[in-house]
């Protein structure tokens, strides 16, 4: 190892590689937004209202996810209940 190689900067990814990586992130994000059903926000509000009839919770305690894998759609509902 020479003295000059010790102080040499590590190779940085090219701007094209960085742009490609950023584009992949944007495309993945938009694909996720496109696959989101239109009824999901209303479903979340309706579920929150039903749960509020029995338990006092805020909207941030309810999380709803819809996944579609191979033609099979799944609905995942997570509710954080307060301690009694």
UniProtKB/Swiss-Prot annotation:
InterPro entries assigned to the protein according to its UniProt record, in alphabetical order: MinE, MinE_sf
Pfam families, sorted: MinE
GO biological process: cell division; regulation of division septum assembly
Keyword Cell division: yes
Keywords of this entry: Cell cycle, Cell division
Protein family per UniProt: Belongs to the MinE family.
HAMAP family: MinE (MF_00262)
Role description: Prevents the cell division inhibition by proteins MinC and MinD at internal division sites while permitting inhibition at polar sites. This ensures cell division at the proper site by restricting the formation of a division septum at the midpoint of the long axis of the cell.
Name the record gives this protein: Cell division topological specificity factor
Gene encoding the protein: minE
């Amino acid at each position: 190892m020479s003295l000059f190689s010790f102080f040499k900067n590590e190779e940085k990814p090219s701007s094209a590689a960085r742009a490609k990586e950023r584009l992949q992130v944007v495309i993945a994000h938009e694909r996720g937004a496109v696959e989101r059903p239109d009824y999901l926000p209303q479903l979340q509000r309706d579920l929150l209202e039903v749960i509020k009839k029995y338990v006092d919770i805020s909207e941030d305690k309810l999380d709803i996810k819809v996944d579609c894998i191979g033609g099979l759609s799944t609905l995942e509902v997570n509710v954080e209940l307060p301690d009694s």
